[in-house]
Amino acid sequence: MLSPAPLYNDLAVGPTNGTGHWVTGQDGVRIRIGVWNSGAKGTVLIFPGRTEYIEKYGGAARELLRHGYSSVAVDWRGQGLADRLQLDRNIGHVINFTDYQYDVQAMLRAADTLGLHKPYYLVAHSMGGCIALRALMQKMPVQASSFSAPMWGIAFHPPVKRVMAWGLSTLAHPFALSETRAPGTSITAYVTTEPFATNSLTCDAPMFAQMKAHLEAVPDWALGGPS
């Protein structure tokens, strides 16, 4: 079921015909999709990374349209304007990582309902790359896929931190701590406190400034550390 949702076209700086839609997944969680439906060559499904939101990909949608493609991006559960699963909306939490597949299925159903141009293609970044890999293994109907820094593993330096993470995650569930913020992570969004000179996200100063401006304009997009 689709219903109108906000899409901040002025902040996205994407194609001018962007529309937002609420979509409810099979498990009842409501997500948001943003659609730019002008390119007739096909539609690119955009799978954002953790902490991201649709409007961050307006520039990508503009470039895709320049090459003849429509696009659709998603706010995953727990981030952007999609349903947050905890009272503290700054904690990025999902019950099971596989639950993101409900969002993928809802996104695909919405694309079909809206009659978006086929074939479908995929661009996936970071955490979106991990979600996309599982979806592809489950035969998601896309013609081709492109991955940007996919989260197919998490680097720990020094490696002993990986052992500590395993131990903490194993103990968190029986002690009812699995929904609390992971140790060492912040309650605030990274780009709101980290200076550009020392940030680990991008070497593109205008992009970093844009991300910061986005969260100042729409604080509800902000997300702190994961559970």
Specify the residue positions occupied by each region the protein language model found.
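Alpha/beta-hydrolase-fold enzymes
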Residues: 127, 131-224
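Conserved alpha/beta-hydrolase
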Residues: 54, 61-87
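Active-site glycine-rich loops that stabilize anionic/oxyanionic intermediates
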Residues: 41, 48-52, 60
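Alpha/beta-hydrolase active-site loop
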Residues: 92-112
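Alpha/beta-hydrolase fold nucleophile elbow
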Residues: 115-126
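Alpha/beta-hydrolase fold active-site loops
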Residues: 41-44, 119
